[in-house]
Amino acid sequence: MMLSPDQAADSDHPSSAHSDPESLGGTDTKVLGSVSDLEPVEEAEGDGKGGSRAALYPHPQQLSREEKRRRRRATAKYRSAHATRERIRVEAFNLAFAELRKLLPTLPPDKKLSKIEILRLAICYISYLNHVLDV
């Protein structure tokens, strides 16, 4: 579980981990927002019956940093950019595994190995080479 800088500072105290609802394990109740986020905001002037959208939802300056982040991440542009970055990351990850696979001796040489098999075989092979150098 990754901690935000705010949570990391409080994580030294075991009792503080359970005092914040967001730090509890399981589902995060604030991910989708809460009912209070959608309640009308009191207007400073007027009778409060304006009916405009601005009156129904909090002004962006009134939102917490976390809520602003959630709203930004909910946009199609952000999701598309994130998907592109993730696709590039996964492709680089798979290329690195393919390069490592080429360096490992197996019988037959073209045998398909899973990623965990590649890692375990690499560990054994490096250990073997280390042993050969020590002798």
UniProtKB/Swiss-Prot annotation:
Homodimer. Interacts and may form heterodimers with STAT3. It comes from the Eukaryota. GO terms for biological process: apoptotic process; cell migration in hindbrain; central nervous system development; hypothalamus gonadotrophin-releasing hormone neuron development; male gonad development; male mating behavior; ovulation cycle; peripheral nervous system development. Transmembrane segments: none annotated. Residues 68-80 have a biased composition (Basic residues). Its main location: nucleus. It is found in: Nucleus. Residues 10-21 have a biased composition (Basic and acidic residues). It comes from Homo sapiens. This is Helix-loop-helix protein 2.
